[in-house]
């Protein structure tokens, strides 16, 4: 099952040229770029591992692409995403996030439902590889 999280998630995977163009757009807006990775694609897993520190002072996308390539070499079977962070006063938030690397075989999610006291229902997601 293809994981659909972030911008461009319903499109085919971006090429490195397309990723570079998106990174350059973000840098042109003055946004910092961060690289993150995980092996757990669960929708509630919002805390991915950071690859180094966010890059606040870059002007050229080449620096981000070099870090992305290093992360891909170290974690070829993990999900890798780029986050653009707007540090403007009052915003201070992630403004763009998109997946740039996926494992060859993506896991699927299965939902199980159980009844509890008072007919309340509990849901659980399981990752199946």
From Swiss-Prot:
Could you tell me the Gene Ontology terms of the biological process aspect for this record?
Answer: reductive pentose-phosphate cycle
Q: Does the keyword Membrane apply?
A: no
SUPFAM superfamilies, alphabetized = RuBisCO, small subunit (SSF55239)
Keywords annotated in UniProt: Calvin cycle, Carbon dioxide fixation, Plasmid
InterPro entries reported for this sequence? RuBisCO_ssu (IPR024681), RuBisCO_ssu_dom (IPR000894), RuBisCO_ssu_sf (IPR036385)
Matching entries from CDD domains are given as: RuBisCO_small
Q: Which SMART domains match?
A: RuBisCO_small
Taken from the record, one Pfam family name reads: RuBisCO_small
Q: Which Gene3D superfamilies match?
A: Ribulose bisphosphate carboxylase, small subunit
Disordered, as annotated region = 109-129
Name the domain of life. Answer: Bacteria
According to the UniProt entry, its GO molecular function terms are: ribulose-bisphosphate carboxylase activity
Write out the similarity annotation: Belongs to the RuBisCO small chain family.
Subunit annotation: Heterohexadecamer of 8 large and 8 small subunits.
The record's misc note reads:
The basic functional RuBisCO is composed of a large chain homodimer in a 'head-to-tail' conformation. In form I RuBisCO this homodimer is arranged in a barrel-like tetramer with the small subunits forming a tetrameric 'cap' on each end of the 'barrel'.
Function in brief: RuBisCO catalyzes two reactions: the carboxylation of D-ribulose 1,5-bisphosphate, the primary event in carbon dioxide fixation, as well as the oxidative fragmentation of the pentose substrate. Both reactions occur simultaneously and in competition at the same active site. Although the small subunit is not catalytic it is essential for maximal activity.
Protein name listed in UniProt: Ribulose bisphosphate carboxylase small subunit
Which species is the source of this protein?
Rhizobium meliloti (strain 1021) (Ensifer meliloti)
Recorded name of the encoding gene: cbbS
């Amino acid at each position: 099952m293809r994981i659909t999280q972030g911008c461009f998630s319903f499109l085919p995977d971006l090429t490195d040229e397309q990723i570079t163009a998106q990174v350059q757009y973000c840098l042109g807006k003055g946004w910092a770029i961060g690289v993150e990775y995980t092996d757990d694609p669960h929708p509630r897993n919002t805390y991915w591992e950071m690859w180094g520190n966010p890059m606040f002072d870059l002007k050229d996308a080449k620096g981000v692409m070099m870090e992305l390539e290093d992360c891909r070499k170290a974690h070829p079977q993990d999900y890798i995403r780029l986050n653009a962070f707007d540090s403007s006063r009052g915003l201070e938030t992630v403004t763009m996030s998109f997946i740039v690397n996926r494992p060859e075989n993506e896991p699927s999610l299965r939902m199980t439902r159980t009844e509890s006291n008072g007919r309340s229902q509990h849901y659980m997601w399981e990752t199946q590889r």
